[in-house]
UniProtKB/Swiss-Prot annotation:
Full protein name: Outer capsid protein VP5
Gene name per UniProt: Segment-6
Described function: VP5 protein is one of the two proteins (with VP2) which constitute the virus particle outer capsid. Acts as a membrane permeabilization protein that mediates release of viral particles from endosomal compartments into the cytoplasm. Permeabilization activity is probably negatively regulated by VP2 and is triggered by endosomal degradation of VP2 and exposure to low pH.
Lineage top rank: taxon: Viruses
GO terms for cellular component: viral outer capsid
Compartments where found: Virion
Keywords for the protein's UniProt record, in alphabetical order: Capsid protein, Outer capsid protein, Viral penetration into host cytoplasm, Viral penetration via permeabilization of host membrane, Virion, Virus entry into host cell
Organism: Bluetongue virus 10 (isolate USA)
Single GO MF annotation: structural molecule activity
Amino acid sequence: MGKIIKSLSRFGKKVGNALTSNTAKKIYSTIGKAAERFAESEIGAATIDGLVQGSVHSIITGESYGESVKQAVLLNVLGTGEELPDPLSPGERGMQTKIKELEDEQRNELVRLKYNKEITEKFGKELGEVYDFMNGEAKEVEAVEEQYTMLCKAVDSYEKILKEEDSKMAILARALQREAAERSEDEIKMVKEYRQKIDALKSAIEIERDGMQEEAIQEIAGMTADVLEAASEEVPLIGAGMATAVATGRAIEGAYKLKKVINALSGIDLSHMRSPKIEPTIIATTLEHRFKDIPDEQLAISVLNKKTAVADNCNEIAHIKQEILPKFKQIMNEEKEIEGIEDKVIHPRVMMRFKIPRTQQPQIHIYAAPWDSDDVFFFHCVSYHHRNESFFLGFDLGIDVVHFEDLTSHWHALGMAQEASGRTLTEAYREFLNLSISSTFSSAIHARRMIRSRAVHPIFLGSMHYDITYEALKNNAQRIVYDDELQMHILRGPLHFQRRAILGALKFGVKILGDKIDVPLFLRNA
């Protein structure tokens, strides 16, 4: 269990502070007294913001815009018309989620119509039965199948799809890790197809990169969702190449409504089981290798990262199948005896026993302090049910403080065995507000508002799904806490933009670009 409380770094904080830190040492060691006099006269005791500070630092310290402005790119490709929502705006998030759901449903239906025969041959006719149960015509009462049997079929089919995706990822990763001469014919073909997709993705990212401005956090946008999914999908389960409708594991699950059937019959919400359409590490790698080929080992790392996300989903569905369904069956039988219900139907009371509170579902839950809400907000990030972990990430942008803490696990109907360690969300939240109250940088008004906020529960502003693994999410959170350079890039612009950038850095990660400047050469030609 860990806890970190740290001051946030911004561009334009007092340069006096900067000159007493590592920067000052570099001034004396790198350039000498002449440059030192120049720096002191130019900077004085004033505050230098943004790009000017960046330029002066780069002259003094020899860093490529040194400890300052570079190109910061969000490790996510946004589809046309998509934008990162403000975490404190539930309406903005809700609208985006609904539009995305409708688009995905339409695209998944195309996959079912196009590949139905191949999919049912590969994964069994149960998929069709599950789809008909949800969307098909009403049958005679005698022909209606037992609901519990249908639930088991949906869970088994979903597990089959995830296992197939996991094994294909493993084959591709193994092929990429082998020497080219040692690959089999199938592996050569697989690697060649994957390389073609990466090249297409690389050229699309390159076009976007050329048009980027230097001084803000950037998003790679403009690819249509169909092309993006086809280009970034490592191993399509059915269909190959750059087809516009590729039968990925995610698309097959959506097309046959497996999660919806499981939710409708058992009350178990599996909407958190997702994998990134495009693995963030592949974007980071592509941005690094601008004018050269990406080595096979780097591609293998990205494939293995995606495989980890798929394996997490496999473990989650196995947890539901082995731990939860037997309990479900037992409670179902008890309810039948009490209520005298017929065998074929699952009573709604059974489903309600497996509902869990919204704030404990595996998502990013967003809260704000009741007063000074624009500045003081925090995320409660909950892992998958089989891991049963969570962490707290709080920000006070008024006094530039960040607080990260691992929390104790929750008890609920879908969780794993409990371990008593760590603190609760309420305890972490109260300590976080105490920081703001006791900080020397807090104004009297801000401190009073935080005292009032501490006495009541924070405002719950809704939840968001995350596509990456919980481990990757936690690593992103810790990077936001530790990485001064990243903080400088996300804490710029209007307050709502800073919150968007923080959310983007948490959900996807950020790659900061910039090459080192040859300082002696720079000064010689100045």
